[in-house]
Amino acid sequence: MLQFLVGPEMFMDNNIDSLINKVKQFSAEGWSLGVCHGVSHWERVERNGLLLATDEVNSIVLRLFAYLHDKWRVDNWEDLEHGKRAAENLPALRGTLLSWLTDEEFNLLCTACELHTVCHSTGNPTIDACFDADRLDLIRVGITPDPERMATERGAFYAANLGQFYADTGTSEYDFYL
């Protein structure tokens, strides 16, 4: 007899990569702003975040942030409200795409998205790692990350030591430019 899982249980297959990939696909659907804030940026933010993650960081929230923080952008340059729009749109996904998150994880994700363009740091290790994961990818638009503006110790280290950042990510400075 076949048994089908319904509700939150269907997401408890420990296949986080599959769930993250569904979010990535959702974010890419209809994306029209090109690569500056598109999939390649999101993938680097995810990679950067995992590099920055300490034991205190919720890596699931960090990975989801990578693919959702820019989803509701309306342009690539003058859109300081996109984080707020992301936080306002995420509740619509709570019962579907993000139904497997705990309330704490969902709230962390909303806060990280909302504040990532307007806040330097929060003191929360997960949210601050999200901020720095995004900031370390400023290189793609010719902006060198400022160690003084990073929210985490690791983020500040990598911003001050870009050679080590490139070595640890297996990249070079030329891999980032658009």
Regions picked out by a protein language model, each given a short descriptive name:
Residues 39, 43-46, 63, 103-114:
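Short, well-structured alpha-helical segments
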Residues 19, 97-101:
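Short helix/loop segments within enzyme catalytic domains
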